[in-house]
Amino acid sequence: MKVGIIQQHNGADHTDNIHRLQERIRQLAHEGAELIVLQELHNGLYFCQTEDVALFDQAETIPGPSTESFGALARELGVVIVLSLFEKRATGLYHNTAVVLERDGSIAGRYRKMHIPDDPAYYEKFYFTPGDLGFEPIDTSVGRLGILICWDQWYPEAARLMALKGAELLIYPTAIGTAAYDTPEEQQRQIDAWQLVQRGHAVANNLPVIAVNRVGYEPDPSSVTEGIQFWGHSFVTGQQGEMLCDLSQTEEAGAVVELDLERTELVRRWWPYLRDRRIDSYGEITRRYID
């Protein structure tokens, strides 16, 4: 299967951001991509740098304008697309939601982000209610997709549950970067850790991983912080964590990567982690901390 990934530097103009994304989707589809994954909250700026009630106006329903627009494109091109949207579920109830569009433009399923951060410049708890759909893979014409979002990528439990439910791919739309006050050495440690933990999920579950990050500098509209330099480095790994693609740290980019999903069977025969799990001994994993 051929997978397309797009990392983009967004501005405040949603119409322009969407237009540029859709042009890149067309390009990757023409290069043979069957599945195309976009970055987290891809329609606009990463608005969670500040707490502002007016920004809830950016949320949309699902189905809604984005699923209609990108759905028409999926239908035209015959590709599966993974969107990442600010969902308005009901009055006063909002989620950070990934939506999978089938080749015919229909909604194959959605995933609501489960782990919600609350850190300087990442004030997501102000905007998003934690997901309530669980860790459920989404069946599509290109395979069973284990969709997770950004902060979820640091939790091996999420990847494992997707794998145990038959996911054939692990997919992470992402918005992550460094602060201006971080030293170059610290910035590199963070990037390395981000890639390593997800490559570890690939190894531990013998599944390909697709991580798509945004790229470029976005200022903090409140001026409380110095903004975020999103570090790009969108990447794809194989079932043993091997890097198949690693995009630029500073530039917009896209790529088409070929994955062999049948290789999972072979690798799991070599490394039978699922066979050897001691499920009789893991009960305490559900506790916050074992005192």
Write out the residue ranges for each language-model feature.
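Conserved hydrophobic/aromatic positions in well-ordered beta-strands
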Residues: 4, 99-101, 235, 255
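Residue-level detector of high-confidence beta-strand sites
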Residues: 97, 110-112, 233, 246, ...
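CN hydrolase (nitrilase-like) catalytic-core segments centered on the catalytic cysteine
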Residues: 59-82, 150-254
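Active-site-proximal beta-strand elements of phosphoester/diester hydrolases
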Residues: 1-12, 17, 97, 110-113, ...
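Cys-nucleophile CN-hydrolase/nitrilase-fold catalytic domain and related Cys-dependent amidase chemistry
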Residues: 14, 22-103, 108-110, 176-207
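A short, polar/charged loop-to-alpha-helix boundary motif
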Residues: 113-127, 251-268
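Cysteine/selenocysteine-centered motifs that mediate thiol-based redox chemistry or coordinate metal-sulfur cofactors
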Residues: 135-165, 174, 264-291
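Active-site glycine-rich loop that binds ribose-phosphate moieties when present
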Residues: 121-136, 153-155
